[in-house]
Amino acid sequence: MRKLIGFGTILGTLAFAIGCSDDNGKSVTVTVDAGTTPVVDAGTTPVVDAGTTPTVDAGATVDSGATVDDAGPADSGPATCPTGTKPVATFKGDADLGNGQSEQTTSIRLTADKDWELDGVVFIKPGATLTVDPCVTVKGKVGTAATIVVKPGAKIMAKGEAERPIVFTSGAGTRRPGDWGGLIILGRAPVNQSAPTIEGLPVSAETTFGGTIADDDSGAVEYARFEYGGVKLGANNEINGVTFGGVGSRTSIHHVQVRHTLDDCFEFFGGTVNAHHLVCTSPQDDGFDWDWGFSGNLQHLVLQQGLFDDEMNGFEADNDATGTDLSPISNPTISNVTLCGRIMVPGAKKKFGMLLRRNTGANIRNVIAYGFDYGIDIRDAKTHLRANSTQGGGPNISVASSLFFNFKGAAGTNATFPTGSQANPAIGFNETSTTEQAFNEFTWLSVASANNILDQDPQLTACKDPSTPNFNAPSAMYGATGLLVTKAATPASSLPDSTAKYIGAFRDASDKWATTGAWVKWTPEGQ
């Protein structure tokens, strides 16, 4: 996360839109289950299509053929998404908020018979549901800061399938990171800030979130891909690929890829949301970022860094921006992660596999951190106390059953850890300043009971290949006697898969979940 400055200069440039139209007609298309009776505005014509049951709000206005209904299941379709040209419809809210923003006040469905152009910033009103069918492509209109914002009490139901994914991408002819915004989901789960507003948007009542409903339900995002987002609204102020603000534990998030974003792939501002099978490809900031009291469960995460000279970390973690003791303290549970870094030339900005700072807690298991400038940095005094389990009352920081290898280190020599690093633990781990050396990450990770692996090469050189990556270690490292199994920890029962007792995001050398299916895309650098 790049910290924010200068909101006031960008208010007039924002435009977010949720809706479905390029005209202002009153016609509504309704899809109805056989045997059901729809509630329809006067003058509308229902279209019967066995399989869905709508509820249409009185007076709803939907343009360009969007379907208004409840978030029921999508109609069954072909095994894969059809190819060919589709008509284009504009997706924009039915209530204009000014400054390029709109609000969708009724439930609405985006169907796969069209491509959808997202025109500006669109807020989904509390009580309304945005349903996006499998095989839908939503293209952010360049120059409008196109972003979907699901407000607390609203829902998004974007449930794709492995071979029939939902794609959110740039509408530009030549696509680049930052062409459009992204997806922001705001909920009513606990955060440690008072009436916070979400990063990337101007401060307003429209962008507040958080509450006391730990099991809040903001819907589902499954088998979906987000590309070329992270629009820059001002200096150090970009929207993440997917942002979660106070999202609750009943929300379903899995099999989501963010690629080529100008900011973080995934950021969690407080909340209790659980997510699994997340892929972050070539971000220009961090892979997975949390703060403001996030306490969810994350499992099966993959990061592939790109060729950018910036402070891009695998994990970047804070309790808040200044490391206060505000409660709840950030304390996620994380397991089964493969972080594939990209060591840059000497003098480039530092990149850490894990940057844990500003009083965060964390329970981290079964991670491979490979190929960063530094494997891990536990930074600042309060965070050191949590790592040493001496921060009164907890929570603490624990990193165990994890493998760290192939770092540039302090000397800038691309030394492979731990060559030379017992004499100088800074190589491959923390920075060289006196403050950072007050905590020795090498010694901390080396405690026998932690079961970390600090001297074995997982041979993941192909994990950096942008078009045909291989994130799997050799077969010998798996199996009953392989280090990635014998040193692994049993995942916490709160995680989606407590049977995943192996280090890294993949069960064995043949497990290819992050490179299989139409929901993920791998292309040469810059494409």
Where are these regions (language model features)?
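Ser/Thr-rich, Pro/Gly/Ala-heavy low-complexity intrinsically disordered linkers and tails
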Residues: 20-80
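Sec-dependent bacterial lipoprotein signal peptides
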Residues: 1-18
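Beta-strand/loop edge motif enriched in small/polar residues
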Residues: 21-26, 76-527
